[in-house]
Amino acid sequence: MAAKATGVVGKVRQVIGAVVDVQFGDHLPAILNALETTNVGNRLVLEVAQHLGENTVRCIAMDSTEGLVRGQEVRDTGAPITVPVGPGMLGRIINVIGEPVDEEGPVDAIEMRSIHQPAPTYVEQSTEAQILITGIKVLDLLAPYAKGGKIGLFGGAGVGKTVLIQELINNIAKAHGGYSVFAGVGERTREGNDLYHEFIESGVNKKGGGEGSKAALVYGQMNEPPGARARVGLTGLTVAEYFRDQGQDVLFFVDNIFRFTQAGSEVSALLGRIPSAVGYQPTLATDMGALQERITTTTKGSITSVQAIYVPADDLTDPAPATSFAHLDATTTLNRAIAEKGIYPAVDPLDSTSRMLDPMVVGEEHYAVARQVQSILQRYKSLQDIIAILGMDELSEEDKQTVARARKIERFLSQPFFVAEVFTGAPGKLVDLADTIKGFKGLCNGDYDHLPEAAFYMVGGIEEAVEKAQRLAAEAA
């Protein structure tokens, strides 16, 4: 391997948290090269970020630097960080530098790939408008996902991004014939652990990997240094790109893209860069573009990516979520006000968008029903001030009817999740697109005006709502 041949040795000159300065004799490693040393008996990888002159480089550490001392020897590998790729990754968990962390022995790799790859060229890219059915009513109706597209789940703290991404994994990855890659970027270790065991229990993966496993996991969780969190998304993407290049349709889940930006901003200040708006790194758009442009569908295969994006203080104009918007085909916005009403998934039907909601793609009926639902909800929203001040009695008969239908639609957009079954006790529901359209069409046309609001809350298809209404009537009698 070329990396072994270069083995030029330098010495640690300075350690400032996650940033380490290394000086070489008459050699200067290239930017993004991986340098290796040992720290407390463990392999420590440093990535070159800056040239400081006089053969000194400033590096970002991929693991804790506690115990690292000045004068310690560091070897230049002569190549960027490389990670194992191939079918041997399925069912396994690796970290940012490709080491297995699931205590199941070494990873069986076909080849080693650099985590820094160029984005596919214009001619290699492929665009095909096809819908990805999720079985979640609000998504399929109002902001349908594209096969081979990029989907962002935006939401503040605790409104249900991770639960929604886990439900999508449950509904799509389990039914999906191809492979999935999950990148845990700076999120809770507990959730990563739960997901790993959930995959084994549901048969998506076999314990210890190997034949029959369909998902690869790449983790760099909250407790990791910023270097690992800033690069683990690229590691996951490299694994996904390999499967795509083999002609697979890959699902790539990232939780959470904001932590990638946050890690970049943590190391940016230590590297001496002048911060930009709100203290973020000046290279925010470049970093995001370098990651997002690689997540794309080529003529060889497709990558459909679902990314959870944390919204700091529920402010969608914050530079981190705002930079992500430009790269996405569909945006699903989770709203705290909807979560407070107890409506889950707390998707904002008026704030979520998709370029697939086009009559040429979804068909005239679907498009007309979706727009009608949105117009009823928008009318209800504009009437809320009047209702708050004057009460319902001051509304016209037509407006009263609109409000009644809107409240039913709002409740019918909720749905019990499979992954939340343990918390709610309600069995999860998958709703077919045709049933979703039929149900909302009936609601908009007033076919269900005689049913109570409560009948539409946390049900699957419209038949269930009718059954629930009959049950409620029988209980009340």
Curated annotation (Swiss-Prot):
Membrane topology note: Peripheral membrane protein
Cellular location(s): Cell inner membrane
Protein name: ATP synthase subunit beta
Family: Belongs to the ATPase alpha/beta chains family.
Gene giving rise to this polypeptide: atpD
GO cellular component, as recorded: plasma membrane; proton-transporting ATP synthase complex
Keywords associated with the record: ATP synthesis, ATP-binding, Cell inner membrane, Cell membrane, CF(1), Hydrogen ion transport, Ion transport, Membrane, Nucleotide-binding, Translocase, Transport
GO terms for MF: ATP binding; ATP hydrolysis activity; proton-transporting ATP synthase activity, rotational mechanism
PROSITE patterns (UniProt xref): ATPASE_ALPHA_BETA (PS00152)
Catalytic reaction(s) noted: ATP + H2O + 4 H(+)(in) = ADP + phosphate + 5 H(+)(out)
Residue positions binding ATP: G155, G156, A157, G158, V159, G160, K161, T162
